[in-house]
């Protein structure tokens, strides 16, 4: 796996979302690199890790990263949040705290009942994206990044940035795109949240149409030492359109953590 390290200060690991790469965090890097040492990861099959031998699977990726990186605050955006959460739950000694940006322990809505997850994405939408990958994966990515930008006060700017950055480090591996969708569909880390061993920050975009802020609020309520914050007027990628606000939230959170 490719890891790019930038800046100096306390260590922060940044994990990108589906179909993207570490370069997507550029506006946040500009805000934070003077205060933190940032470790930007390209997950297997993405960006400069397109030919990585490691599979895109939560446990193996986390194990590889904790062996290579110092103890740090881990930040995960969208899909990347599943890896950050797993690190916090399974490799506590390596994680000072975990920040989830527009991410959820469970991405898909569950049926009604005691374990219902009311605010997840419709399973039918996931199936539609999976079918689209088989028929027209480029068009499917275009639809997905449009959904990511939708709702933001700066939707056109956000869409342009996502579109320009999508293939900036080459095309993602087509098979890994399907694997990533399966992770988003299948993984459910909710049962582990009440025993979360490190502090957590759940940072939502109020107008996010991919991860409902209400799902993030509910997840934060399940975990001890958790805080929920919301970026007004932001969609699914608030670090693109409101990088200063996201950076300030991370600074406050990091300052509250034990060394």
Task: Please state what every model-predicted region is.
Residues 89, 94-135:
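Flexible "cap/lid" loop of the alpha/beta hydrolase fold
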Residues 76-80, 84:
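Gly/Ala-rich beta-loop-alpha elbow adjacent to hydrolase catalytic centers
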Residues 134-187, 191-192:
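Conserved alpha/beta-hydrolase catalytic His-Asp/Glu region
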Residues 209-215:
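Conserved alpha/beta-hydrolase "acid-adjacent" motif
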Residues 2-54, 58:
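Conserved HGGG/HGGXW glycine-rich cap/lid loop of the alpha/beta-hydrolase fold
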């Amino acid at each position: 796996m490719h890891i790019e390290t930038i800046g100096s200060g306390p260590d922060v690991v940044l994990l990108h979302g589906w179909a993207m790469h570490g370069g997507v965090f550029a506006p946040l890097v500009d805000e934070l690199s003077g205060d933190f040492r940032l470790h930007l990861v390209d997950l297997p099959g993405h960006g400069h890790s397109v030919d990585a031998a490691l599979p895109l699977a939560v446990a193996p990726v986390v194990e590889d990263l904790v062996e290579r990186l110092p103890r740090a605050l881990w930040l995960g955006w969208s899909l990347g949040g599943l890896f950050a959460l797993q690190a916090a739950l399974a490799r506590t000694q390596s994680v000072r705290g975990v920040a989830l940006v527009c991410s959820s322990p469970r991405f898909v809505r569950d049926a009604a009942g005691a374990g219902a997850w009311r605010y997840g994405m419709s399973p039918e939408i996931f199936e539609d994206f999976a079918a689209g990958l088989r028929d027209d994966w480029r068009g499917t990515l275009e639809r997905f990044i449009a959904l990511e930008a939708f709702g933001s006060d700066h939707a056109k700017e956000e869409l342009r940035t996502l579109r320009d950055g999508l293939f900036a480090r080459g095309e993602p591996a087509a098979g890994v795109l399907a694997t990533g969708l399966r992770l988003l569909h299948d993984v459910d880390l909710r049962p582990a949240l009440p025993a979360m061993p490190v502090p957590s920050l759940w940072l939502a975009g109020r107008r996010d149409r991919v991860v409902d802020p209400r799902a993030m609020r509910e997840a934060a309520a399940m975990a001890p030492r958790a805080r929920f914050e919301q970026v007004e007027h932001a969609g699914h990628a608030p670090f693109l359109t409101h990088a200063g606000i996201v950076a300030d939230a991370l600074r406050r959170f990091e300052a509250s953590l034990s060394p």
